[in-house]
Amino acid sequence: MKALLSLLTAVAVATATPLDLSLRALPNAPDGYTPAKVSCPATRPSIRGAGSLSPNETSWLEIRRKNTVQPMTDLLGRLNLGFDAAGYIDRVSSNASNLPNIAIAVSGGGYRALTNGAGAIKAFDSRTQGSTQSGHLGGLLQSATYVSGLSGGGWLVGSVYLNNFTTIADLQSGDHGNVWQFSTSILEGPKAKHLQFLSTADYWKDLLKAVDGKSDAGFNTSLTDYWGRALSYQFINDRTGNGGLSYTWSSIALTDPFRRGEMPLPILVADGRNPGELLIGSNSTVYEFNPWEFGSFDPSIFGFAPLEYLGSRFDNGQLPRGEPCVRGFDNAGFVMGTSSSLFNQFILRLNKTDLPDLAKDVFSKILTAIGRDGDDIAVYGPNPFYGYRNSTAAYSRSRELDVVDGGEDGQNIPLHPLIQPVRHVDVIFAVDSSADGPYSWPNGSALVATYERSLNSSGIGNGTVFPAVPDVNTFVNLGLNTRPTFFGCDPANLSAPAPLVVYLPNAPYSTHSNTSTFQLAYSDSERDEIITNGYNVVTRGNATVDKSWPSCVGCAILQRSMYRTNTSMPAVCNSCFKEYCWNGTVDSKTPRTYEPTLLLGSTSTNAAYTQGVTWLVGILAVGVAMGMTA
């Protein structure tokens, strides 16, 4: 393991010019990256059942739902619905369960997902200049209760929240140190203004030192630890200059703005992998990280651990007397890295890339070796669910819990936390930046995976209901992969309450935003062009593609609420639902290759499907060093 990291260090040094590191900014870990023993609270931490929301989330929701009333009133009032939206929200606001309950989900897909998703968040944020003008959707973020992300979408969610719920514009501007400076690869390290590191070699030594500290304290580590530390340098604005070393995911819950309910609840998603498995199936356990807890609603676990005390040695849901409490395990970078442990996924997607055959062969051999040694996962040990409920499941008998990228089960949009009945979500704005086809555009596979899982005969869906969606061929043949589509428009057709899903697939409005998941370096202009394109995706070019789109967004927001309150929908919603709701039509013949053209005028040179050269050179060099190219 350390030999492999040393090789990566050597490769990075050999292919990079000397670099600097700048400063970044919730650190509350007791000993930096190393989890440490601390005094237990008077009520010792324990695992709780997943039959309800946590007391923390329940009490927070009482505050947050009230805080969405005014932003929602303002937003709906701007969307040309032709009825008294403010009056309706005022009438139902006395009972929060009748208010529209909005969620936003941002898919995985590396930096492509980060930047395209950032465009969506920027469009939904009323703080973005111009976002509350006619044709725009600013205020949807302020009206939302939940925001979920996985993999690259998780980096986006994490970076926004760990930098004090900052704006996308601020992250682009450089006002937060050197976060979001992607012109150099994560393998090389960030550019430095404050010269903490003089070179890439120093950067890698720092990563190694931090992870060694965790290992020396008795915790098993994997490649995800190094990956997470590297991500922190790109996404956390730590003013001490040490790359978010002491930042924890649970510390989000301690910030005053979050406690006041001034922002949605952030959730990251990851998948479980049983001991001895390499590939992740559709019935794998789906875990979530929210600011208070780590766990799963799936029947395999059906429990949640207090996130702040991960690393403590729980047994059958309790922390035995004599066992110390541990804090600092939920390092923010490690959590983001867990949700984006792409190493296994790279093997699955290699043949869909334009990498040379030699590179594919080398890459496959390296990653297979990593997977065989168990280094491609995030190790959560001690396993907080060891012996929990006296379960016979494989996870319960393992002292460690293996967790991987949240999209490896095919559910590349983090819908799982949002379709749980106890959360009562009404509408999900699902931003899909998946690379499903040969040119890295989405084709609805992520929605299909979630729908099929809800029907799985194994019972893994555990009572969740998801609207019907067509097969992926139909998505492409009907053009549902090119424009927004609503699923679940008529709640009367559902077997139980479920959200309306507004599907927002990545498409080329102003630039070709289908960059490769393998691309690890972006110029500022390329980054910004894809963010602008993402803004255009969710606003339909600020309603220039369809002037009725903002009204239709309002209809999607209101539909479930008005159904519950037996209120007639605005007349404009009839035409909106006719235009955007999937009507059940299926066309499953093999589609032609999807090669779209720009929907709006180009803002840049073509940014289509490119590989990260530094990554490729690094992999080949490692392969040569390991004797894998013979």
Curated annotation (Swiss-Prot):
Q: Where in the cell is it found?
A: Cell membrane
PLA2c domain: residues covered: 39-587
Record EC number: 3.1.1.5
Question: What are the GO MF terms of this UniProt record?
Answer: lysophospholipase activity; phospholipase A2 activity
The positions flagged as glycosylation sites are: 56, 95, 164, 220, 283, 351, 390, 443, 456, 462, 493, 514, 542, 566, 583
Query: How this protein is processed and modified after translation, per its record?
Result: The GPI-like anchor contains a phosphoceramide lipid group.
Signal peptide residues on this chain, from the entry's feature table? 1-16
Q: Please state, per the UniProt record, what induces or represses the expression of this protein.
A: Strongly induced by lecithin.
**Propeptide residue interval(s):** 607-630
InterPro entries, per the entry = Acyl_Trfase/lysoPLipase (IPR016035), LysoPLipase_cat_dom (IPR002642)
PROSITE patterns according to UniProt: PLA2C
Please give the GO cellular component terms listed in this UniProt entry. cytosol; endoplasmic reticulum; plasma membrane; side of membrane
Reaction(s) catalysed by this chain's protein: a 1-acyl-sn-glycero-3-phosphocholine + H2O = sn-glycerol 3-phosphocholine + a fatty acid + H(+)
* Keyword Lipoprotein recorded: yes
Q: Extract one GO BP annotation from the record.
A: glycerophospholipid catabolic process
Q: How does it sit in the membrane?
A: Lipid-anchor; GPI-anchor
The UniProt similarity line reads: Belongs to the lysophospholipase family.
The record's annotation in PANTHER family points to: CYTOSOLIC PHOSPHOLIPASE A2, LYSOPHOSPHOLIPASE 1-RELATED
In its UniProt entry, what is this protein called?
Answer: Lysophospholipase 3
Query: Per the UniProt entry, what species is this protein from, by scientific name?
Result: Aspergillus fumigatus (strain ATCC MYA-4609 / CBS 101355 / FGSC A1100 / Af293) (Neosartorya fumigata)
